[in-house]
């Protein structure tokens, strides 16, 4: 067994030969490498599969024996300073390794078809393999120095992946935004690491945890400084895992190819921040203020991410905000000390979210031949609808992923989210109420996404649709429905009343004037004929196979953490994890009984079903029937109440669609402020600093010229100066005598 652990150091480096081979091939024999580009997918999947098998073997041994293995190499720089490099194999490492490799494999298989047409296919594979290497190196690190090295490599890979389509301006801006935002967290992490080393004199985890704990308990270090160092470490995790207030890069990162979105949101970049907090939790637990801060940031992110997802039209942005919210649950669990529940939800969410992202990729892939290859159209849920009869396999897998994220039993996320909700009651009823309420919001926006995409009719075939990007010719109601909107250009819509406002339940269709239609026809595509032969098609088998694999994970991975609800011992996760860090369940024999489990589950599931019901009433196939029968209007009479309700809906929509105005605040308070400061500094530098130096030079020039002119050897110049000084002296004498 120990023989197996001795070779665990190879785990991060197994996928690396693919990146190196592709790079050397493109450098030395570019033509042959590009001609055989599809061949590189096989070694990418093969090497990552070897890593997965090795990681699984280590995990099985840990489950059976609860072993923790660490190996260190000491590098002595001088007598007073030495660095230790090595690897650490503990339950957290094995969990993250399996998560990274399994999700990475299905994403690579999926990408072989999805990215086959892209000219950057080889670059895509090299980036993906190097990203897996960086993430595996991060989770196997045994000290803070290695953590920081691989942390920066993960950030670099994320920058390269987000900017994969760098020729598109929005993608280039997105990768820069992600890079700058994460540099804030990286700087905080570096300062925190240096501060901890100054306190403890060690970078290695075990020594650092023990020394730090003893210093805190014995008052051997200033408590404020120790809290500051721990806070700086947490800032790095906040930025990397897109937690409030450094979450603004996440929705813009959806400019990447969809397989990259699945990898980033499930197993790599956003999971790195959660891993860091879990790894350093022994430091955070001895400082209660930090634990409270972690829980507070988590619960704010939970609610913020859910509210921002309510009115999104882009299917990938909706999933991005969902990731932000679900990682908030994980951060909340870590903040309240529920270590097991946090890692459990990290596992279940990773597979469910990978399924949803790859499912959205299949949807986008089916829509692109119809609406074009612009993300503004192919990812717009308003142009979808009715896809269930065209892509039934994708529909089924996406529905299962949706139910899982909504917390519907017996799917994966139900078990982990329910455990977090229960533990939150023990920590803070206020946090618990927010977490439970957000569970209902999650069910609402996830089922809204499903209904807009798969139910009803294919919206793109509606009469009067055109593919113009400008929203002035068509508009979307606040909840994603198509509706009228006043046109502010010099077109005349014959039946539109510009004073009429968009109604929440309105389905009225306005006819476009013939002149306008003729003008539009010259630069847009029309789908007036509902019987057109162009319809979405189901994806190829190489894209459907990963979806089916992830469905199996979504169905059964939750069973590894079922605790106390059956007579059989299925709780593999508790055997896997070292439970001593869990502050809430210190009694290892504690587990909820059947009655307690069902009471808690019924409450949380009822909230989820309520959110699904609201979404179904607003977007389901019976929506038009409810409207025609005025069942909804029975509850909302015309008058002040309806006006108030419309205002509330508009406030919610504006908050969600404008990203909570946080980006606007950053653009106003930070971006413009920094630019103004830069302009002021530039002005001061040009006018003051350069003015002084240039003034000295100019003055020296004129003085020199004057001296040169006076001392040129001319008698006339000497006489002139002599008379000039005589006149000055006489003038001064006269002036002095008068005084």
From Swiss-Prot:
<dbReference type="Pfam" id="PF00361">
    <property type="entry name" value="Proton_antipo_M"/>
</dbReference>
<dbReference type="GO" id="GO:0009535">
    <property type="term" value="C:chloroplast thylakoid membrane"/>
</dbReference>
<keyword id="KW-0813">Transport</keyword>
<feature type="transmembrane region" description="Helical">
    <location>
        <begin position="219"/>
        <end position="239"/>
    </location>
</feature>
<feature type="transmembrane region" description="Helical">
    <location>
        <begin position="280"/>
        <end position="300"/>
    </location>
</feature>
<keyword id="KW-0812">Transmembrane</keyword>
<feature type="transmembrane region" description="Helical">
    <location>
        <begin position="396"/>
        <end position="416"/>
    </location>
</feature>
<dbReference type="InterPro" id="IPR018393">
    <property type="entry name" value="NADHpl_OxRdtase_5_subgr"/>
</dbReference>
<dbReference type="GO" id="GO:0042773">
    <property type="term" value="P:ATP synthesis coupled electron transport"/>
</dbReference>
<keyword id="KW-0472">Membrane</keyword>
<comment type="function">
    <text>NDH shuttles electrons from NAD(P)H:plastoquinone, via FMN and iron-sulfur (Fe-S) centers, to quinones in the photosynthetic chain and possibly in a chloroplast respiratory chain. The immediate electron acceptor for the enzyme in this species is believed to be plastoquinone. Couples the redox reaction to proton translocation, and thus conserves the redox energy in a proton gradient.</text>
</comment>
<keyword id="KW-0934">Plastid</keyword>
<feature type="transmembrane region" description="Helical">
    <location>
        <begin position="425"/>
        <end position="445"/>
    </location>
</feature>
<dbReference type="InterPro" id="IPR001750">
    <property type="entry name" value="ND/Mrp_TM"/>
</dbReference>
<dbReference type="Pfam" id="PF01010">
    <property type="entry name" value="Proton_antipo_C"/>
</dbReference>
<keyword id="KW-0618">Plastoquinone</keyword>
<keyword id="KW-0874">Quinone</keyword>
<feature type="transmembrane region" description="Helical">
    <location>
        <begin position="258"/>
        <end position="278"/>
    </location>
</feature>
<keyword id="KW-0521">NADP</keyword>
<feature type="transmembrane region" description="Helical">
    <location>
        <begin position="327"/>
        <end position="347"/>
    </location>
</feature>
<dbReference type="GO" id="GO:0048038">
    <property type="term" value="F:quinone binding"/>
</dbReference>
<keyword id="KW-1133">Transmembrane helix</keyword>
<feature type="transmembrane region" description="Helical">
    <location>
        <begin position="597"/>
        <end position="617"/>
    </location>
</feature>
<dbReference type="InterPro" id="IPR001516">
    <property type="entry name" value="Proton_antipo_N"/>
</dbReference>
<feature type="transmembrane region" description="Helical">
    <location>
        <begin position="184"/>
        <end position="204"/>
    </location>
</feature>
<feature type="transmembrane region" description="Helical">
    <location>
        <begin position="719"/>
        <end position="739"/>
    </location>
</feature>
<keyword id="KW-0520">NAD</keyword>
<feature type="transmembrane region" description="Helical">
    <location>
        <begin position="9"/>
        <end position="29"/>
    </location>
</feature>
<feature type="transmembrane region" description="Helical">
    <location>
        <begin position="144"/>
        <end position="164"/>
    </location>
</feature>
<dbReference type="GO" id="GO:0008137">
    <property type="term" value="F:NADH dehydrogenase (ubiquinone) activity"/>
</dbReference>
<dbReference type="InterPro" id="IPR003945">
    <property type="entry name" value="NU5C-like"/>
</dbReference>
<comment type="similarity">
    <text>Belongs to the complex I subunit 5 family.</text>
</comment>
<dbReference type="Pfam" id="PF00662">
    <property type="entry name" value="Proton_antipo_N"/>
</dbReference>
<keyword id="KW-0793">Thylakoid</keyword>
<dbReference type="InterPro" id="IPR002128">
    <property type="entry name" value="NADH_UbQ_OxRdtase_chlpt_su5_C"/>
</dbReference>
<feature type="transmembrane region" description="Helical">
    <location>
        <begin position="40"/>
        <end position="60"/>
    </location>
</feature>
<feature type="transmembrane region" description="Helical">
    <location>
        <begin position="542"/>
        <end position="562"/>
    </location>
</feature>
<comment type="subunit">
    <text>NDH is composed of at least 16 different subunits, 5 of which are encoded in the nucleus.</text>
</comment>
<feature type="transmembrane region" description="Helical">
    <location>
        <begin position="89"/>
        <end position="109"/>
    </location>
</feature>
<protein>
    <recommendedName>
        <fullName>NAD(P)H-quinone oxidoreductase subunit 5, chloroplastic</fullName>
        <ecNumber>7.1.1.-</ecNumber>
    </recommendedName>
</protein>
<feature type="transmembrane region" description="Helical">
    <location>
        <begin position="354"/>
        <end position="374"/>
    </location>
</feature>
<dbReference type="GO" id="GO:0015990">
    <property type="term" value="P:electron transport coupled proton transport"/>
</dbReference>
């Amino acid at each position: 067994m120990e023989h197996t652990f001795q070779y665990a150091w190879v785990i991060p480096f197994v996928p690396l030969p693919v990146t190196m081979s592709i790079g050397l091939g493109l450098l030395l024999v570019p033509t042959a490498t590009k001609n055989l580009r599809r061949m590189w997918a096989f070694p990418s999947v093969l090497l990552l599969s070897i890593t997965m098998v090795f990681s699984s073997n280590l995990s099985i041994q840990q489950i059976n024996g609860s072993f923790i293995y660490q190996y260190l190499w000491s590098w002595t720089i001088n007598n007073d300073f030495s660095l230790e490099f090595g690897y650490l194999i503990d339950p957290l490492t094995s969990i993250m390794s399996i998560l990274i490799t399994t999700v990475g494999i299905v994403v690579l298989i999926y990408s072989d078809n999805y990215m086959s047409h892209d000219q950057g296919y080889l670059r895509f594979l090299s980036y993906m393999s190097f990203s897996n290497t960086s993430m595996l190196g991060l989770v196997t690190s045994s000290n803070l120095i290695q953590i920081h090295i691989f942390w920066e490599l993960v950030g670099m890979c994320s920058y390269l992946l987000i900017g994969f389509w760098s020729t598109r301006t929005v993608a280039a801006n997105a990768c820069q935004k992600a890079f700058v935002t994460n540099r804030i967290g990286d700087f905080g992490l570096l300062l925190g690491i240096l501060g901890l080393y100054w306190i403890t004199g060690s970078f290695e985890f075990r020594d650092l945890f023990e020394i730090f704990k003893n210093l805190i308990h014995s008052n051997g270090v200033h408590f404020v400084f120790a809290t500051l160092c721990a806070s700086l470490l947490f800032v790095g995790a906040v930025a990397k895992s897109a937690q409030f207030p450094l979450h603004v890069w996440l929705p813009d990162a959806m400019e990447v190819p969809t397989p990259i979105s699945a990898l980033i949101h499930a197993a790599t970049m956003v999971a790195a921040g959660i891993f860091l907090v879990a790894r350093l939790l022994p430091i955070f637990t001895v400082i209660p203020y930090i634990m409270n801060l972690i829980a507070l940031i988590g619960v704010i992110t939970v609610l913020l991410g859910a509210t921002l997802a309510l009115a999104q039209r882009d299917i990938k942005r909706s999933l991005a905000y969902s990731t932000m919210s679900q990682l908030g649950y994980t951060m909340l669990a870590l903040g309240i000390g529920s270590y097991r529940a946090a890692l459990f939800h990290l596992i279940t969410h990773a597979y469910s979210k990978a399924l949803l992202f790859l499912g959205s990729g299949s949807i986008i892939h089916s829509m692109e031949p119809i609406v074009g290859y612009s993300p503004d159209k192919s990812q717009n849920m308003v142009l979808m609808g009715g896809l269930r009869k065209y892509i039934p396999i994708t529909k089924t897998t996406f529905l299962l992923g949706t139910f899982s994220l909504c917390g519907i039993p017996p799917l994966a996320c139900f078990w982990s989210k329910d455990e977090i909700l229960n533990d939150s009651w023990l920590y803070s009823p206020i946090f618990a109420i927010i977490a439970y309420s957000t569970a209902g919001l999650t069910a609402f926006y996830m089922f809204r996404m499903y209904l807009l995409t798969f139910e009803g009719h294919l919206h793109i075939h509606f009469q009067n649709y055109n593919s113009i990007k400008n929203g002035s010719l068509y508009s979307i109601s606040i909840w994603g429905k198509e509706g009228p909107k006043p046109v502010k250009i010099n077109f005349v819509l014959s039946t539109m009343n510009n004073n009429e406002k968009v109604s929440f339940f309105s389905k009225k269709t306005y006819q476009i004037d013939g002149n306008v239609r003729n003008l539009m026809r010259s630069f847009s595509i029309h789908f007036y004929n509902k019987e057109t032969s162009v319809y979405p098609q189901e994806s190829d088998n190489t894209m459907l196979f990963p979806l089916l694999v992830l469905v199996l994970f979504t169905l059964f991975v939750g069973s590894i953490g079922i605790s106390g609800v059956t007579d059989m011992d299925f709780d593999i996760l508790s055997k896997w994890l070292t439970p001593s860090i869990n502050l809430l369940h210190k009694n290892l024999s504690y587990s909820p009984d059947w009655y307690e489990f069902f009471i808690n589950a019924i409450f949380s599931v009822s909230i989820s079903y309520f959110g699904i019901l609201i979404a179904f009433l607003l977007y389901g196939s019976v929506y038009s029937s409810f409207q025609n029968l005025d069942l909804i209007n029975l509850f909302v009479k015309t008058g002040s109440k309806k006006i108030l309700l419309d205002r509330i809906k508009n406030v919610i929509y504006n908050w969600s669609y404008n990203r909570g105005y946080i980006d606007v605040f950053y653009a106003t308070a930070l971006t413009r402020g920094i630019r103004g400061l830069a302009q002021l500094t530039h002005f001061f530098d040009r006018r003051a600093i350069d003015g002084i130096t240039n003034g000295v030079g100019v003055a020296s020039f004129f003085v020199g010229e004057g001296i040169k002119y006076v001392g040129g050897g001319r008698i006339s110049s000497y006489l002139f100066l002599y008379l000039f000084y005589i006149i000055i002296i006489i003038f001064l004498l006269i002036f002095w005598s008068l005084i």
